[in-house]
Amino acid sequence: MTKRPTRYYSKKQENLIAKELGGNRQPNSGATMFSKGDVVLDDWLIEAKTKTSPSNSMTIHREWLEKNEEEAFAMGKQHSALIFDFGDIHYPQEYVIITLEEFKKLIKGE
């Protein structure tokens, strides 16, 4: 069986997130000069990370979070988040990482 390229899984995840949140998937995963991130909402820039096969763990790099925050600011977005999954199609659960400050705003309804 031929293994699909990483891009296949990333694009699938990005499309799912965009559909679920009512946003738009960025072409080429935001690799252009002015369009960054993977999924864009009105006030949010989303970075998406997935595994190509089921896993029990996921390494989160600080660089991913910091870069997404910087790109969100540069694009005039008020919020940034990293959404990831463990690559398991039988348990397709997505998880969201935001700062504690963002979380406080959400629970206070700000």
Language-model region placement:
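Catalytic phosphate/metal-binding cores of nucleic-acid and nucleotide-processing enzymes, i.e., regions
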Residues: 1-110
